[in-house]
Amino acid sequence: MTQDEMKKAAGWAALEYVEKDSIVGVGTGSTVNHFIDALATMKADIDGAVSSSEASTEKMKALGIPVYDLNSVDELSVYVDGADEINAHMDMIKGGGAALTREKIVAAVADKFICIVDNTKEVDVLGEFPLPVEVIPMARSYVARQLVKLGGDPVYREGVVTDNGNVILDVYNMKIMNPKELEEQINAIVGVVTNGLFAMRGADVLLVGSPEGVKTVK
C-alpha cells in the first residue's frame, strides 16, 4: 500500500464513530480529506459538520455537507483529525497545515477525539517533526527568544498566515519527554496563541492505516 492508501484506509475507518443525526467535528489535512470524502457518502444521515479550517470547510461545502459555525453548536460527539506525530500515550504534534488553534478549539468541544494517521506518524518520542507555534505577528521575535530558552530552534514559516491572521514558528530539535508540561510552558509565553502539542487534550481513539489494514488503539 502507498502512504496515501494507508491514509485513505484510516479516514474511511473513522466513519464507524460517526453517529446518525449528529454534527461532526472535522479537522484538516491530507488524511482528513479522505475522511471528508467518506463522510459525504452519509451526509443524508448527519446534521452537518464543524470545521477547523477554511480548506476543510470549502471541501465539505463542495460535497454538499452542511458546515456550521462552532458558536452555534452546543456539543460535538466526535472530532476526527490527523496528526503529524503521535506517541503511545495519545499525545500529538499537530499544525503542519497551520490550523492548530482552530483544531485545538474544536477538539476541546468534542466528547471524543478520533485521530486518523498512516503508520509513519507513530513515534516513541515527540519532537522529530518540528513543533508549530502560532504567534501574534508583533510578538514573533520575542516568542522566538523564549523558545530558544526552552531548548528549541525556532524558524519563522515564511509566507504563511493562519486563518486567524497570525504567523507560525516551527520549533526544531526538541525531544519532548513531558508533552503536557511543555504545552503549558509554551502557551504561557506572552504572544503565543497556542502550540501544536495536543497533550492536555490528546486523542481518545487512534486509527492507524498500515499495509496490514487499520489498527485501532484506545
Curated annotation (Swiss-Prot):
Chain residues that bind substrate: 28-31, 81-84, 94-97, 121
Pathway as given in its UniProt record: Carbohydrate degradation; pentose phosphate pathway; D-ribose 5-phosphate from D-ribulose 5-phosphate (non-oxidative stage): step 1/1
GO molecular function annotation: ribose-5-phosphate isomerase activity
Pfam families: Rib_5-P_isom_A
EC number: 5.3.1.6
Keywords: Isomerase
GO cellular component: cytosol
Catalytic residues identified in the record: 103 (proton acceptor)
Enzyme class: isomerase
Catalysed conversion reaction: aldehydo-D-ribose 5-phosphate = D-ribulose 5-phosphate
GO annotation (BP), single: pentose-phosphate shunt, non-oxidative branch
Family statement drawn from the similarity comment of this UniProt entry: Belongs to the ribose 5-phosphate isomerase family.
Job of this protein: Catalyzes the reversible conversion of ribose-5-phosphate to ribulose 5-phosphate.
Subunit details: Homodimer.
Identification of the protein by name: Ribose-5-phosphate isomerase A
Organism: Shewanella sediminis (strain HAW-EB3)
Gene behind this protein: rpiA
